[in-house]
Amino acid sequence: MEELSGKPLSYAEKEKLKEKLAFLKKEYSRTLARLQRAKRAEKAKNSKKAIEDGVPQPEASSQLSHSESINKGFPCDTLQSNHLDEETGENISQILDVEPQSFNCKQGKEVLHTPRAGDIQGQLLHSTSSPDGKKEQNTLPGTTKTPWEKSSVSQEKEDYFDTNSLALLGKHRKGQESISRKNSRTPVSEKTHLLSLRSQIPDPPALVTGIGEGILIPPSGKSERGIDTLVRGNTVSAEAAVPSCTASNSNHSQHLEHTPPKSGCKITTQGPASSTNLVAQDQKMTIFTVNSVVYKAVRAHGQLPGSPNSCSVNDLTHSNLPANSTPNSKSLKSPSNTVDERNEPLQEDEILGPSKNFNLAAVSPPSTESQIHSCTMLEGLLFPAEYYVRTTRRMSDCQRKIALEAVIQSHLGVKKKELKKKTKATKAVVLSSEDTDQSESGMLDTSTGQSSSGSLSQKLLSPAEVSSPPGPAGKATTPPPGRGHRGKRKSARTSTLGHCQLLFPPCAALAVNRSKGKFTKHKCQNRGVVIHDFELPDEDFGLLKLEKLKSCSEKLIESPDSKNCGERLPREGNHAALEELQRDSETEGLEEELTVPPGEAYRPGPTLRRQPGSKDLSSSIVLFTPADTAAPNDSGRPPPSLCSPAFPILGMTPALGSQAAGETLSTEAAQPCSTSQPPLLGDTNSLVNNSKQCNSSACSPKPDTNLQASGRQGQPACDSDSGPQATPLPVESFTFRENQLCGNACLELHEHSTEQTETADRPACDNLNPGNLQLVSELKNPSSSCSVDVSAMWWERAGAKEPCIVTACEDVVSLWKPLNSLQWEKVHTWHFTEVPVLQIVPVPDVYNLICVALGSLEIREIRALLCSSGDDSEKQVLLKSGDIKAMLGLTKRRLVSSTGTFCNQQIQIMTFADDGSSKDEQLLMPPDETVLTFAEVQGTQEALLGTTTVNSIVIWNLKTGQLLKKMHIDDSYQASVCHGAYSEKGLLFVVVSQPCAKESQALGSPVFQLLVINPKTAQSVGVLLCSLPQGQAGRFLEGDVKDHVAAAVLTSGTIAIWDLLLGHCTALLPPVSDQSWSLVKWSGTDSHLLAGQKDGNIFIYRYF
């Protein structure tokens, strides 16, 4: 523990650590060398066998000639399975040939006769040719363990079953051949091993050993692997053992019959999906040959349910899959891999669809030899170096190249691009959103598991079959029907959208690596294998473990009633909803009810409404919170990190519905200003949690007073006898649609009281709630002209930067500096005599520079206002002139502007130097539509968003100037003004205002709207509509958005504030002294709200 305390190491200790690290690297090198030697030896052996087996064998030829007539009608007698060796690029094939003995014709049918039951041997002989021409036979693993069986345990390769490995008829064969050619990656050479059921041993079948359990040994070296298949043909049924051995094919008018004196086997084949069932002494061995994939299942005392469209077994121990699968889905078996009835589930390799060439990344348990139990602590490493060594060894099954140095350097925090490229983690399977732009890509279907286009070559794994290794990332399993499994498992639920496109990016539990074109899926590891993890002694590392667990638990915020939110089956239909993993419990909705005591002053209710989505989307689509967003602290109020580009934190969006869908919520004793506990991905937590109570007393307008006092019922409220009143709004009349979140919604309100807030001249309490407005100070307008704009910026004077207020009237712009918390002093003034001032353009990261827009009705000039460093005199610099349609100040001291229309449009970015002069200009690619507004995308660097006159949203790359995407949004958002854009998990969250929106009885008076756009598919949906509270009149006049709060001036002269996290109006600021509000802006230096009146007076409020 000396190393953990930060004690510097001596030179000898450093040398010793270097030697130990070198030793650890050597251990890895040796492990890799052994693995490579084994692969090379096996490759050489297989190559030699392939050359020798390339000569046609006369016995095989005679057998084929004898059974030519049957092979014509029964194409599945020769069973072949291919697997691709990634190391050598060779395609190794295995052929299972059922050799008939004699044929007699009876009534037009061909009959096979064999002398006795022992002819059909359960032994699958591995026939190869030795250098001297003799044949070698490898029998059951109980008698001989061959070298290829031993090496199969440590092999790190993926098995591929070529879909062209069996002879198919008609279109199936042509389709499979074409798909196989598309999916072939490298030229391969074939190694063929003939497996025949020889009739050379007249003894009873050697298949029955021990307690009546048989083993099929595939000759590919994978003797301990089970093989799954896709059942695309007819049903394969297994019946009880009868003293006969029969093979029938009704489709091809063939009948194979064998009746030995002591038979215990029955072979049944139905339709093109042929199978071979061997039943001997109350045990069963089945070989399925379904569309070129060999299925092996060995189990005792079991039967296959014979339904027309399924092939499954009773025993689904390791994946809990449903008992019946769909035609294009698979059944997972748990074959035995020993003779003593251990029945352990093995890892399985599967082909899940020819169109995407799926494969399984095999994960084998780590080797337990050469265990290093010492503890070597290095400065900067959280755990001993041996921990990372053993972790890397366990990861070696998923990585093609081990880089111990990369693992250690990554934990030390050293970022090296070349090391990052080498490390490819394949533990989690992630469905990339890149496939959403393909109109013919297969969608995950909960009913059939096949693509909506219906093509046989486009099939995907159904959600009932998705499983991942257990771990902190969660599981994706589906319990069998009729049984409800509750616990820590999570369910992955999917549904389809229109034409195979997703609105929301998929969760991190599934992934398609498009560059490789393969879909990988992890299965549960063998339960019989014990994985020995590196254990840290508790006596030495107990405190470190506790700190690590504590830091991890703080990141996972769980709602107190998360047990009420749980697993629900998705609705049937064509709705796009890819929901994240959710907890297994039932959601019952909202039953709480709060009451308003009589005698309280009128307070308008919240107006959170869910606008129906676009024409292609259903209103049942629910937006969940991105995983990377910030979470509130324990006090329930938003932390300062919420006022950051990480936006938005949204729970389930309540929709407009009837009273039957949800209970009406009222307020109790006060005005609750609710804060949202943002649900993590996969949690269907409440939209509003830990709501806090605060009330406001009616008071006469007078500055420098607290606008709101909060307290419990019965406690004296703070006297607020002056100042413009800011009315916080209660959470009232939340309604939900029945179809929201598949018919269930969860909303919990928890009441907490807050301490009484202080007045303006006292420090505020720490537990202040959102929705409070506190008047700080007031600026009196000395000029007679009306105020047109106000802003806050940093101004540097005498080497010190201080926040200043900039006020703009029609003919003068003034800069105010603070004298104290309540008084301001005018420092600089710029006068304009020719062209009036229209607005102030704040530019972030720029000091001692003010940008203003001049013009009568349209912007004609952009000027920079600054002061000379010598005499401190004011001066003006013309930056741009012309028909300016839009402009915006960007980070890194940049200003973007758009001039002209259509073909003559020019979009230019101007960069300012430290002294305020323009030093660089850049042109952006103009769209074919006139740009009206700009918005910088928070959360994504170098991204700019703009809105056009024809209701489109365009995105630029600021670094290259390229126009990335143009997306048309719904026509219901006509003449929308973009106020902010945020990016999370590949989605765009855009806040727009609708000045021309009409008031409706259903939606009220809409002011702000939150749109979610998928740039990949150009689909958009409105998820949040901020409307005026009930009883408030007017329409949107002017507004501003900062982080998660939005403020707007209404035509009635009132200022309303919405919290986008809560989704409802939190405060109202009525007119003061019969002077209506004319403008409102959020301060860029702090959380102050700047409100201006028509007479030019500016009021500064603190919002918390």
From Swiss-Prot:
Query: What sections of the sequence does the record tag as coiled-coil?
Result: 9-48
Q: Where is the composition biased (Polar residues)?
A: 59-70, 138-154, 306-338, 664-713
Key words, A-Z: Coiled coil, DNA damage, DNA recombination, DNA repair, DNA-binding, Nucleus, Phosphoprotein, Repeat, Tumor suppressor, WD repeat
A single GO BP: animal organ morphogenesis
State the residue spans of region: Interaction with RAD51 and BRCA2: 771-1104
Q: Where is the stretch described as Required for its oligomerization and is important for its focal concentration at DNA damage sites?
A: 1-157
Please give the residue ranges the record annotates as the region Disordered. Answer: 39-91, 122-157, 243-272, 304-354, 417-494, 581-730
- MF terms in GO: DNA binding
Concerning Pfam families, the annotation shows: PALB2_WD40
Q: Which residues carry this modification: Phosphoserine?
A: S274, S364, S432
Report residue spans for region: ChAM (Chromatin-association motif).
374-424
Matching entries from InterPro entries are given as: PALB2, PALB2_WD40, WD40/YVTN_repeat-like_dom_sf, WD40_repeat_dom_sf
Localization per record:
Nucleus
Q: Where is the composition biased (Basic residues)?
A: 483-492
Question: What are the boundaries of the region Interaction with BRCA1?
Answer: 1-308
UniProt feature, compositional bias: Basic and acidic residues: 39-52
Residue stretches of each WD repeat: 772-833, 835-879, 880-927, 928-970, 976-1027, 1033-1071, 1073-1104
Its UniProt domain note says: Interaction with BRCA2 occurs through a hydrophobic pocket at the crossover between WD repeats 4 and 5.
Subunit and partners? Homooligomer; dissociated upon DNA damage thus allowing association with BRCA1. Oligomerization is essential for its focal accumulation at DNA breaks. Part of a BRCA complex containing BRCA1, BRCA2 and PALB2. Interacts with BRCA1 and this interaction is essential for its function in HRR. Interacts with RAD51AP1 and MORF4L1/MRG15. Component of the homologous recombination repair (HR) complex composed of ERCC5/XPG, BRCA2, PALB2, DSS1 and RAD51. Within the complex, interacts with ERCC5/XPG and BRCA2.
Q: Protein name, please?
A: Partner and localizer of BRCA2
Organism of origin is Mus musculus (Mouse)
Q: Which gene encodes it?
A: Palb2
